[in-house]
Amino acid sequence: MESKKEGVASAPTSPESRRTRSNGKGKTIAEATPPSVTVVSTKVTPSPRGGWRKGAAILDFILRLGAISSAIGAAAVMGNNEQILPFFTQFFQFHVQWDDFPMFQFFVFANGAAVVFLILSLPFSIVCIVRPFAVGPRLLLVIVDIFAMALVIAAASAAAAVVYLAHNGSQDANWIAICQQYTDFCQVTSQAVVASFVAAVFLICLIVLSSVALKKGLKREFGW
């Protein structure tokens, strides 16, 4: 009996069994490494999307199409303008055509050139829609629009002066008003001049819009 008791009492207790018992009782182990904590940042960095600049670029494209349509209409109407009176003599035929007047020739050329410049500027206007913060394309558009506006306003003003003389004449210079005979010719000419001035208004709006957007872009890019 004593030998059995001594055998039971002398049974060694291993460290692994102690750890197992301590784990069973819910105690933490000193040798265990603490779990790592991962910190996730929920801060969202806003990406620039253009905002009102993209809307301004879309409006620029629409105004550009309006200017192209008006200038094409002005050049086409003036370029096809002529009138032949129903009466004639043995030696004379009363006929008037747009190319009889140098100012009307310049009118057709200037509006046609403005149309070409505006059509070539359409891809750059699309680039401004895709990239609202681009500065280079907007600067190029402002330069093209100023040049086209100068052509259109000069042509419309010169043609308007001739149309005024055709309607009213000049007593001081003894110029008669030919519109009393060539009514259809003068009416079509007046319509072409009005269309050209409408194109000039579109171009002025384009220049103002592009200048404001360009100023904001330069301020954002360079701090000017």
Swiss-Prot record:
Q: Which residues are glycosylated?
A: 168
Which InterPro entries has this protein been placed in? CASP/CASPL, CASP_dom, CASPL
Which spans are transmembrane here? 58-78, 106-126, 139-159, 192-212
Q: Which domain of life is it from?
A: Eukaryota
**What is the protein's membrane topology class?**
Multi-pass membrane protein
Instruction: Give the subcellular location.
Output: Cell membrane
Q: Which UniProt keywords apply?
A: Cell membrane, Cell wall biogenesis/degradation, Glycoprotein, Membrane, Transmembrane, Transmembrane helix
Q: Which residues lie on this side of the membrane: Extracellular?
A: 79-105, 160-191
Kindly state one GO CC term assigned in the UniProt record.
Answer: plasma membrane
In terms of Pfam families, this protein maps to:
CASP_dom (PF04535)
Residue intervals on the Cytoplasmic side: 1-57, 127-138, 213-224
Tell me the Gene Ontology biological-process terms attached to this UniProt entry: cell wall organization
Span list, region Disordered: 1-30
Q: How does it assemble?
A: Homodimer and heterodimers.
Task: Tell me the protein family, please.
Answer: Belongs to the Casparian strip membrane proteins (CASP) family.
What is the protein named? Casparian strip membrane protein 3
Question: Which organism is this entry from?
Answer: Vigna unguiculata (Cowpea)
